[in-house]
Amino acid sequence: MKRLPAVAGSFYESDPKKLKMQIEWSFRHNIGPRDIPKQTYEKKKRDNLFFVVPHAGYIYSGPVAAHSYYYLVSEGRPDVVIILGPNHTGLGSYVSAWPKGEWETPLGSVKIDEEILMQLVKESEVIDLDEKSHLYEHSIEVQLPFLQYFFDDDFKIVPIVIMMQTPEIAEFLADAIYNVMQKNPDKDIVVLASSDMNHYDPHEITVKKDVEAIEKIQQLDYKGLYEVVEGKDVTLCGYGPIMVNLILAKKFGKKAYILKHATSGDTSGPKDSVVGYLAARFGS
């Protein structure tokens, strides 16, 4: 079963050569890390297990996303990347995993880790196997070219989209991921929470709203983050995935480190209506 790219040519370049140049542009951008990370091939225990990455078009959020990937790549190639994204389309079930096969992008194909996936399904009791949720969803797809640029096809993924973004669902998923990671100590597993921040307010308002959410992220306060999103009109689209990583970070004794916060007004667009972007890592 192959999942074909839905947003190649719109969110990112469809030509492989141009796409690689776009990824390099993201790293070298003045909002980005300004350098391309050197990949280590030395196998050692990973410190940064969990990340927040944005998922807009690369010209807008690529430089911010590059900060998270800089840290991920610097610690070497993971065996498995669990990618949690919000469900923008409204299709499919409340929590949906792509069941098997591979995902294709202009840079090639990446296989699903079916063994880890089925362990998660068994542990969580809330994950459905459902392709429909993923067919047109961009929040996971846009992460793959960044990973493929450095690791080619030498890693596997578990793609999960979350429509019901509640603290209770986040707890179920975090418990399942934690248990699976504990049962597979020899597998190098990383979890990406794919999310943009506040949407379509002027730059100054977006920054103010985002800061309220970022404070909760720094405190690993997943219920507080939920309250900010629900109670203060912060239109953060992937708060469910972020809540999962906040719970996981606390379980593993990690701290939150904000790598970069910017808006589309900082990267490529006007500042009268912007989207906020955050790169964060959770490590020692």
Swiss-Prot record:
InterPro entries attached to this UniProt entry: MEMO1_fam
Domain of life: Archaea
Lineage per the UniProt record: Archaea, Thermoproteota, Thermoprotei, Sulfolobales, Sulfolobaceae
Family: Belongs to the MEMO1 family.
Classification via HAMAP family: MEMO1 (MF_00055)
Protein name per Swiss-Prot or TrEMBL: MEMO1 family protein YN1551_0739
